[in-house]
């Protein structure tokens, strides 16, 4: 019999009554965590060494701290407005950041908020290196006695939905049972903010041992602020968009590269003439690129795409709304086989239209606008979106391989990496000193699937350089002391300078392909290192494309389309006000211009000597319209100068 409670303290007491000794708790990644319940449980045991707590989870999300100086003036009001003052910060994350978890509390994560825990010994030491598809088995091996999860309630009904996280809860229960272990207690916290998703994400309330429903409004869901998309991002997204085949399957990751790709696909479909003009300006030879001709296309989507991605995010909203994603699939193997054979009849077509789904994911995470879109979906559209287990989404070997091969035709798996070697290895999740930036997540799964499916391609996207000016360094490296994707799985890489197709190529060919998408400043050194390592024989002159592969040439090529709005700063919408959108580039410029003592002093002197009065609205937003102290006046001058510099760009 499922218990129903409305009080956090009573829920914690109920759990502790039923579990003797150590608590071994599983919780979903991302927004599926019941923050309030986890905080209450942590608060109860933090000072009780007799009650050890082990938490198995990933991607524990807390809003950023405001920082100091100008950054705090910007971030403080934004964080309050965007996340809400009542957002329940995860206490264990704040403790980990200080390495302040007590000895009897351990948090194991297989994926971390990107870069957020690089300086935490506790987080780094207890990181677990796992493919997303292996997480359920790893949790089961630890014999969890409690799983907690946030759920949505069915409007006008009695069922509950795993909604944002149908990823590993059911897989974990199956793995626990396979080991002959007792089923853990399952506790759900109902969140009124969480969108209802039916289908395989829906369960009866009896699936849980206890359902907690706290009265009153729920805090906002954690919302990712939508970030500005740069010309570099757009170039990468535009190149990537040419590798997508109509009628195919699409997986995309997260971040501004994915945002740029989503916008480029929408532009290709809704304004093909402009799309082709942008591509012509970016690279006049792109349409004849062998990879584009063999694997992609430039035409609008007559059939549409099927979205199959571990994470559903902002880009998918845009792709669904614009009609790019609309190719439906069905879980009936016979029907899918007949569609593939061309023998489907009118009844099959009607059933596909009525029962099929065009978008599958395992979890979702996005902005408040994305969650509002999910909540407001027309029922018929909502029924075409299915939240599935990660064992279904991220691999072919979950028991339905024949079906999934038919559904995932012409699959394109787009993911980001930080660096790539000239021989085709990718660095996506960690540093060469062993520290983890994030985690492999599903990236390996998708790369492997691209090699397992016919006509599928894995595309890893990266910016050609990091930092700028004299501090610029190439992200196309000869080698690096950490690897996420090994070179024997090399496929396609994209930077802002083009497409490198490495699949089945020799090492020399791979080096030349990667040099072709490297920043011009670093091509010579890269090719020289390759020669020293005996990976090059004679290098043709055309291998170096120094004139084209520069930031200045790229900005010049895309500038007209940035100005006319074809490539907007915020293609998926913005969570920042117009004033904040002017402030962001100014603050970014100022941070770069004050890195190092000499640069900081020079920038300060120029700012103090500048006669610019600044942007009144921006100064008001930063509470610097009427500076009250010497420090305030210096900050106001620096900000006004930075606004002047970025206004001129």
Give residue ranges: language-model regions.
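Conserved alpha/beta enzyme-core scaffold
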Residues: 1-649
